[in-house]
């Protein structure tokens, strides 16, 4: 599930009020509706969201004051409570799409209830790993922002702007901290970008482009590896690092026309090359034992806690790279072939791939 965008129409100081950069524009929504009606493979993919949306109509928002997940082991009550509350993001995402597809205001009204409940209770922090878990909430809001009441829009805008501001000034992105160059920073940049484009607030423009270029220059390697892969010795972190970067690239490309997916750093690295590096591991031509040489103590703690996939030597499973390749397929549909090989299914389709099909990509 995650973030796609539309064509740019910039005013002198603000984005066009009708533009939607973190979700689908009106023409794309129309195409989505038509596709869901005519093509069973698309309607089947959306069915799960429809079920969630219908169930959510009778549910009460469950916002949490501060999201606490980063650095906590599975089973920690603080993490458990946060992840339970964050189920709201998936619910509101489903509600927003159900509204756009059906036009039924009951879905919009319930989505608005979730937005405002979170806006009133949740507090912004500068921790990007905690804040990134609100991504679906931001995407959903972008989809329906022009449809909610002015009062609800102001309340939700202020909440999201507070998150973006906290991340812009995040201590984790400063100095010589490892979090200033690893996946933390990739997620920080993504959330700033998605919120900025959702709110049509161009005060973040220079921050987004400057920070992204800096991150690509320090995080990507010419051979297709990333800082995170080398540090953690796990494709789990190659994917967790480049997924937010690709999401940011999609938003920027759709808003400005600049393609950072193929953009070369000073040493010749590109995000595309980092995706391509994973291809033989996705197709099964190569295997990779995960976390064997990780230098991060927390990885060992998670393994000792019995968390799936963190035991040193666990083989990378191609299914865990599918979302990465689905995002990359926005820029190059050739990745769909790799995805289907990885899934051993010539007809495989997921929601991100469907969204790519609904999305108008510039030539």
Regions inferred by a protein language model and the residue ranges of each:
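Long, repeat-rich segments with strong aromatic
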Residues: 199, 203-289
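Extracellular glycan-targeting catalytic surfaces
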Residues: 18-178, 186, 254-363
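Positively charged n-region of N-terminal signal peptides that target proteins for export
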Residues: 1-4
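Short gly/pro-enriched beta-turn/loop segments at secondary-structure junctions
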Residues: 187-190, 240
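Amphipathic alpha-helical segments within well-ordered protein domains
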Residues: 95-96, 138, 192-193, 246-250
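Extended amphipathic alpha-helical interaction segments
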Residues: 157-169, 179-188, 195-202, 209-218
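Hydrophobic h-region of N-terminal signal peptides that target proteins for export
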Residues: 9-18
């Amino acid at each position: 599930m995650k973030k796609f965008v539309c064509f740019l129409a910039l005013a002198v100081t603000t984005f066009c009020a009708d533009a939607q950069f973190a979700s689908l524009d009106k023409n794309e929504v129309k195409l989505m509706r038509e596709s869901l009606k005519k093509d069973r493979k698309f309607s089947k993919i959306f069915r799960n969201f429809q079920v969630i949306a219908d169930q959510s109509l009778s549910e009460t928002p469950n916002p949490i004051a501060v999201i606490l997940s980063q650095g906590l082991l599975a089973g920690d009550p603080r993490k458990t409570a946060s992840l339970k509350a964050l189920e709201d993001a998936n619910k509101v995402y489903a509600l927003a799409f159900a509204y756009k597809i059906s036009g039924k205001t009951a879905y919009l009204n319930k989505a608005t209830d979730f937005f405002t409940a979170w806006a009133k209770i949740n507090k912004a922090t500068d921790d990007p790993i905690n804040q990134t878990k609100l991504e679906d909430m931001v995407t959903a809001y972008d989809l329906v922002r022009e449809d909610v009441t002015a009062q609800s829009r102001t309340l939700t805008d202020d909440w999201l702007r507070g998150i973006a501001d906290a991340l812009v000034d995040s201590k984790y992105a400063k100095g010589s901290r490892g979090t200033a160059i690893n996946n933390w920073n990739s997620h920080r940049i993504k959330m700033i970008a998605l919120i900025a484009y959702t709110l049509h607030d161009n005060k973040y423009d220079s921050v987004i482009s400057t920070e992204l270029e800096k991150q690509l220059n320090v995080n990507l390697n010419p051979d297709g590896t990333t800082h995170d892969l080398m540090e953690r010795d796990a494709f789990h972190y190659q994917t967790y690092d480049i997924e937010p970067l690709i999401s940011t690239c999609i938003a920027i490309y759709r808003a400005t026309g600049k393609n950072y997916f193929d953009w070369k750093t000073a040493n010749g690295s590109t995000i595309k090359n980092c995706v391509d590096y994973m291809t033989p591991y996705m197709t099964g031509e190569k295997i990779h034992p995960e976390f064997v040489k990780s230098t991060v103590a927390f990885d060992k703690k998670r393994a000792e806690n019995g968390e799936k996939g963190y035991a040193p030597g666990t083989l990378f499973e191609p299914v865990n790279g599918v979302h990465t390749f689905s995002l990359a397929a926005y820029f190059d549909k050739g990745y769909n072939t790799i995805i289907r090989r990885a899934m051993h299914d010539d007809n495989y389709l997921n929601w991100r791939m469907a969204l790519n099909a609904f999305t108008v990509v510039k030539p």
